[in-house]
Amino acid sequence: MSSLLPVAVYGLEVPPGDILVPAQFEFPATIRITMAAIDPTAEPETDGQGNVPTVPRSTLKLIKTTAEEDDDEYLDIDGEDSEDDEESDDEEVNGGPSDPAKSKKARREAAIKKLLEATKEESDEEMEDADAKPNGKGKKDSKGKAKASESDDEKSDEDDEEGEPNFEEFVVCTLDTERTYQQPIDITITEGEKVFFVVKGTHKVYLTGNYVLPEGQDEEDDEDEEDYSDEEYDLPHGIELESDSDYESDELDEIDGTPRIKEIDTDEEEEEAPKLVDTSKKGNKKRPAEEAENLDDLVAKDKKQAEKQKKLKNNKGEAVPAENKDVKKEGKSDKKVQFAKDLEQGPSGPAKDKLEKKEEKKDDKADLKKPSLGVKVVQGVTIDDRKLGTGRTVKSGDRVSLRYIGKLTNGKVFDANKKGAPFTVRVGKGEVIKGWEIGLIGMQVGGERRLTIPPHLAYGSRAMPGIPANSTLVFDIKLLEIK
């Protein structure tokens, strides 16, 4: 069952008596039943004579229909051509006595009725044996009538056997009020499968489990999520997908304690200006025309000064006077101030954007490692720590136990675990929605946290029981244990 993921809670109540209760599907998914239980404190129901057994108990049975191989053939008996069938359907919209759909429904109802009568035969036979008289004549009459009725029943059974669905009955478990109140089971019912439950005994049987979906369905949702843009969900600035080249350039640009603009006394300074211009091109963002001209003028001016210095040195064969060096240094300082201004205050400087992104990533990592009270956004999930816990923090791969309440943004509760067995999950293994995988990291035992999860990190465009499509979900979580 590792290929199926639980998505919602399933529950079914089966009362005692000859009542067939179908396994109802509230929405298209597979049902997995994992527990059958009774309430030992409830009053036991009496039998037909008003008696209660010494040890009240209930037996749960599963009844399923076998595959009806001739259903399609039966529907196609009246015509071999699909066109003829369409014409006949148009002529008789409401159907008639020989309508295949009606006859099929009637046969199923008759079969269910027959099954209910069969379940009563056991108790009826015991009552008949107790009320039977010892008179020999009476016995002969009853036998004669019984034979006649049996022959009639056999004839009617032979007539009804053709076309009726077959039922298979299986005993699941027997529960009593002294030792066995509940029984773990593992029954999977696929969508469209005809399955019924019936209980014989004194108490109601409660069946619980989950609606489950195949893992492959999540991959389709992931493909849909790729179509969503950042603007559609209004992601915070800096929380976005980046290429590997961006990460490499960030690591090269950021070294603690190193100034962003470094003074170089050699001729390598002449090569710095083209590099800065190239970085702006790398970011695929254009500077205003005026700023571009300023940069070009500065570069051209610097090159002219360098050429003059070389000419003086070549013609005279002497070192350049100190005054000219001072002028050159002043030119350097002016140029550096101008470049720093463009980098820090330019409307589209890539260095500034990368620095901001890197700082936000550092803040996210710090928030995960050291939880603190307050609201923060981590990878699109809004985390509000209401109470700090103690001990080590949750990391990927940990199995945790917790309580939670799930709500929509309008305050409507769609799921909760407030008592009984706590909810357990292994973090980072795809057992829950992505918003939980992100929001549980960094919690401590005893801590309380509110997660606000956008749709693309929850169920996306898929509607769930009590959860409309594209819903933002709010979870209040209390961590009980880290295993």
Swiss-Prot record:
Residue numbers spanned by region Disordered: 41-171, 208-371
GO terms of molecular function: peptidyl-prolyl cis-trans isomerase activity
InterPro entries: NPL, PPIase_dom_sf, PPIase_FKBP_dom, PPIase_Fpr3/Fpr4-like
Keyword line: Chaperone, Isomerase, Nucleus, Rotamase
Reactions accelerated catalytically: [protein]-peptidylproline (omega=180) = [protein]-peptidylproline (omega=0)
Record-linked SUPFAM superfamilies: FKBP-like (SSF54534)
Signal sequence, start to end: none
UniProt key word Secreted: no
Disulfide bond positions: none
Compositional bias (Basic and acidic residues): 108-121, 130-150, 298-309, 323-344, 351-370
GO cellular component terms listed in the entry, alphabetical order: chromatin; nucleolus
EC number: 5.2.1.8
UniProt cross-references to Gene3D superfamilies, sorted A to Z: 3.10.50.40, Nucleoplasmin core domain (2.60.120.340)
Domain PPIase FKBP-type: 397-483
Sequence similarity: Belongs to the FKBP-type PPIase family. FKBP3/4 subfamily.
Function as written in the Swiss-Prot or TrEMBL entry: PPIase that acts as a histone chaperone. Histone proline isomerase that increases the rate of cis-trans isomerization at prolines on the histone H3 N-terminal tail. Proline isomerization influences H3 methylation thereby regulating gene expression.
Subunit structure: Binds to histones H3 and H4.
Protein name: FK506-binding protein 4
Taxonomy of the source species: Eukaryota, Fungi, Dikarya, Ascomycota, Pezizomycotina
Gene transcribed to yield this protein: FPR4
